[in-house]
């Protein structure tokens, strides 16, 4: 009887575990779509700025505050915030369970560390989106504020430098992934028609190259912060876009980067719909 009870309990636990997997997948898919929406909106604002039509070079914080001032903005902020929570949960699963089989060699650990950093960043963005939607303030999580707090800690400069290296490494990985079109291997292409495959390939390639370049610039800013111990050197997407705009032919560079981020947003929505998501043991 005791053995039977234990076996029954184990079977129910396994069944419950299997039943939760589709829900976690849905959260992850919704999360990819929410992330895509964030990049698409940032890209739109940057493109309008490049065209002189009233947009602005902004990161996630500025974009969320801009959205809050629009009709139905608070509803969209709630959707983005909840969606990004799903994205964070899926990134944590990728770090711990390694469903993509990245492994434990140097390359695999760097990639999984990138997922961990991504989970932290998007967790902060989700909190900020929900805070603004609840009229609870901006949440105060800018790169400069975070860097200043880290610099005040023991080994703070080393930590910031390590974060910068991870971000650059992940940015280069995005560049390679986009250029080689390896991301298409993650899609359930048998469920996509020819038009959807074409859009996924084009938007993913250009979008990942643009995002990879922006991430590499952000990582470089973090390393500058570590070297100079000056938190003002830390910049996010807005700083990277402003840096591009300050160069010769800056408006053209800004426009290209903005278009790339918009394409990454489109890719994110397609990714949420068609990416193969497994737990490795399925």
What are these regions (language model features)?
Residues 36-56:
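Alpha-helical transmembrane segments of multi-pass membrane proteins
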Residues 183-201:
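Juxtamembrane inter-helical linkers in multi-pass membrane proteins
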Residues 17-23, 27, 41, 45-48, ...:
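Hydrophobic, ordered structural segments
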Residues 2-15, 208-282:
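C-terminal functional regions that serve as terminal interaction/effector modules
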Residues 58-67, 146-150, 196, 231-252:
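Short, membrane-exposed interhelical loops at transmembrane-helix boundaries
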Residues 35-43, 116-129, 206-223:
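Hydrophobic alpha-helical membrane-insertion segments
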């Amino acid at each position: 009887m005791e053995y039977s009870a234990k076996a029954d309990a184990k079977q129910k636990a396994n069944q419950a575990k299997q039943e939760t997997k589709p829900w976690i997948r849905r959260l992850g898919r919704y999360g990819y779509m929410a992330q895509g929406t964030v990049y698409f909106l940032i890209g739109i604002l940057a493109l309008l700025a490049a065209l002189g039509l009233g947009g602005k070079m902004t990161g996630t914080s500025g974009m969320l505050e801009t959205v809050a001032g629009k009709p139905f903005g608070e509803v969209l902020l709630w959707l983005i915030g909840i969606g990004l929570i799903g994205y964070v949960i899926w990134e944590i699963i990728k770090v711990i369970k390694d469903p993509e089989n990245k492994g434990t060699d140097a390359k695999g650990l760097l990639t999984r560390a990138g997922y961990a950093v991504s989970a932290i960043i998007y967790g902060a963005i989700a909190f900020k989106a929900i805070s603004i939607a609840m009229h609870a303030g901006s949440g105060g999580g800018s790169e400069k504020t975070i860097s200043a707090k880290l610099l005040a800690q023991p080994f703070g400069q080393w930590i910031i430098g390590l974060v910068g290296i991870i971000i650059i490494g992940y940015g280069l990985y995005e560049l390679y992934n986009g250029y080689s079109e390896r991301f298409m291997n993650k899609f359930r292409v048998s469920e996509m028609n020819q038009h959807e495959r074409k859009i996924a390939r084009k938007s993913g390639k250009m979008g990942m190259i643009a995002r990879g370049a922006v991430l590499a610039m952000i990582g470089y800013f973090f390393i500058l912060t570590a070297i100079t111990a000056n938190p003002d050197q830390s910049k996010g997407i807005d700083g990277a876009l402003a840096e591009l705009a300050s160069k010769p032919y800056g408006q053209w560079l800004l426009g290209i980067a903005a278009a790339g981020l918009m394409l990454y947003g489109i890719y994110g929505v397609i990714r949420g719909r068609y990416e193969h998501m497994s737990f490795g043991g399925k």
